[in-house]
C-alpha cells in the first residue's frame, strides 16, 4: 500500500489516497479502478492536472511524476497488477465501459 498525495484540481486542497501498487523497476504503478465505477477516481483527475506529486511507502516519502501508461506497456503492467490483486482489476473492468487507466509514478 502507498499513500498518494495530490492537490485538488479545483479546491487546491491537499488530498491523500491509499492505493495498492506494484513495482516496475524504480517506478511505482497504480490502477485508477474506483472499483469499476463509471467515472475515474478524483485522484486520477488531480494527477492529470498536476502530475508532479509525492508518494509515501512505509516511512519513505518520494517525489514522483505521474504518467498514464499506454499500449504494450499498459498491457504488461495491467497484467502484473491484476495478478497481484488476484483478478480484481479484471473484475472491475467488466463492470464499467471506461478503460481503467494504469498510472506509472516515476521517481524524480
Show which residues each predicted segment covers.
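Short beta-strand segments
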Residues: 1-35
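Short, acidic/polar N-cap/turn motifs at the starts of alpha helices
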Residues: 1, 18, 50-52, 89
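Short, structured beta-strand-loop surface elements
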Residues: 34-86, 93-101, 107-108
